[in-house]
Each structure stands twice: as C-alpha cells, then as structure tokens.
C-alpha cells in the first residue's frame, strides 16, 4: 500500500465515523502505520493535523444538518461528537467567526472544509515545453 492510499483509507474511515470517537491512534492502527508516522504523513498530504481535520469535517456536517433540517443546534453538535454546547460554540466561532445561533438565524454562506482528494494523480511535464490547462498556458 502506498502512503497516500493509507491516508485515503483513513479519510474514508473518518467520514464513516464522524458521529463516533476518533483517535489518532485508532486511525493509525486502522491503516497499519505508527501513530507518529501517520500524523506526519496526514499533515503533509491533507495540510491539517488529524484532530483539526476531524473537527472541521464535523463542523461541516453540523452545518449541513442545520441547513437541511429543523434539528436543534445542540442536538446536531452532540450527534457529531462535540461534548457540549460550549465546546461546539467555541469551535464554530473560532472557525467561522460567528456563533452557531447567528448562523442558524441567517444561514450565511460559509466556506466549509470538504474531504480532500489525496490520490497521486499528476501529469509529468517536460521543462521548457508550455502546458495548456483550461485555456491557460503555463510556462
């Protein structure tokens, strides 16, 4: 298994278990890596530490629920692993700059964190040869 495949597998695991407790050690064991190496690799490929990523994905799922249902803020937060209203409100406000209550009232557009694609799809480019991508020439 390539390193990026282990991270892809862990991202899928996270998505499927956002409503449960997710520890870095459990994720590392799930993909067969040491916790130390897993954390370094995850940060390098996802550009976020593991628990920060989990928090951002949980916030995104809560926002999705608040937009599409009449669920109470506290219930949505508890469903996605936040331990209390205060804990959720703090995380929400630090991330988005508004309280969950103000969000629910106005439903402004927020830039939520989506599951990244970490597969190693790339194009080899010869140096000195222009590359055309979407009507843009990269030299």
What are these model-derived regions, one by one?
Residues 38, 42, 87-88, 92:
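Short hydrophobic/aromatic patch on the recognition helix
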Residues 33, 82-83:
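The short coil/loop that forms the "turn" connecting the two helices of the helix-turn-helix
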Residues 36, 85-86, 101:
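Key DNA-contact positions within bacterial/archaeal DNA-binding proteins
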Residues 4, 8-25, 44-80, 107-124:
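Terminal helix-turn-helix DNA-binding modules in bacterial transcription factors
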Residues 1-2, 90-139:
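…primarily DNA-binding HTH/wHTH and HhH modules…
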Residues 62, 84, 88:
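Hydrophobic/aromatic pocket-lining and membrane-interface residues
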Residues 25-46:
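Basic, low-complexity segments
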Residues 11-16, 28-29, 37, 98:
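Recognition helices and adjacent regulatory flanks at domain boundaries
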């Amino acid at each position: 298994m390539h390193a990026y495949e282990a991270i892809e597998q862990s991202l899928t695991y996270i998505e499927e278990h956002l409503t449960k407790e997710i520890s870095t050690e459990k994720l590392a064991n799930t993909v067969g890596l040491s916790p130390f190496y897993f954390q370094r690799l995850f940060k390098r490929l996802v550009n976020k530490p593991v628990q920060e990523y989990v928090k951002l994905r949980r916030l995104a799922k809560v926002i999705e629920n608040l937009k599409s249902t009449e669920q109470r803020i506290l219930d949505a937060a508890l469903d996605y692993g936040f331990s209390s209203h205060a804990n959720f409100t703090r995380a929400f406000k630090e991330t988005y700059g508004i309280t969950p209550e103000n969000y629910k009232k106005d439903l402004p557009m927020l830039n939520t964190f989506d599951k990244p694609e970490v597969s190693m799809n790339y194009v080899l480019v010869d140096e000195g040869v222009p590359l055309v991508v979407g009507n843009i020439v990269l030299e």
